[in-house]
Amino acid sequence: MSKVAVIGGGAGGMMAACIAAGNGHRVTLFEQNEKLGKKIYITGKGRCNLTNACDTEDLFAAIMKNAKFLYSAIYTFDNHALMDYFAGLGLKMKIERGNRVFPQSDHASDVIRVLTDELHRKKVRICLNTKVQEIVSDGTKVTGVRWDCHDTHQKNQIEAFDAVVAACGGVSYPTT
């Protein structure tokens, strides 16, 4: 069993942490905000448009001009696998106009709830208000992370990890 750090508590980070923990790793999830999934709350006007239910080839045609760089990722875990994953967590979904997939409740908070429940079931250590300042390396491999926690006023804490997943998100809404 190895120690894995996941940087970023958005959808990708929460899923990465769940999957790593499900594969037997000891996982710590670092999120700089006060709660997980902050950006999820605002997607789809607060309803959380999870994915699109169209065929994979149609998905590529609709969203990308040059999608080749995404082929291996999408064919490994496509939109239908994502829907199956959330269904397995107990999230009821519905498909609307344009094949858009939403939680049946129309509440993004339900998506965050099922992911957070899964993190707890998998015993993922969650560090909120904690900013990873550096991924530490010995020159050949990752050895840990250096983090600061706003809540506990801990600064420059270096913690050893065998692997690090960076799921830091984008800057579409920089305040999230």
Q: Which residues does each PLM region occupy?
A:
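Phosphate-coordination loops involved in phosphoryl transfer and adenosine-cofactor binding
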Residues: 1-3, 96, 129, 161
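N-terminal Rossmann-like FAD-binding beta1-loop-alpha1 element of flavoenzymes
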Residues: 2-29
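Redox-cofactor binding/interface segments in oxidoreductases and associated redox assembly factors
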Residues: 7, 42, 166-167
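Residue-level detector of alpha-helix initiation sites
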Residues: 10-12, 35, 170-172
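Hydrophobic/aromatic ligand-binding patch that stacks against planar heteroaromatic rings
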Residues: 15, 19, 40, 164
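Mobile amphipathic helical/loop "lid" adjacent to a hydrophobic cofactor/ligand pocket
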Residues: 15, 19, 23, 34, ...
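Conserved N-terminal/central alpha/beta ligand/cofactor-binding core
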Residues: 32-125
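Predominantly flavin-linked oxidoreductase catalytic cores and closely associated redox partners
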Residues: 109, 114-176
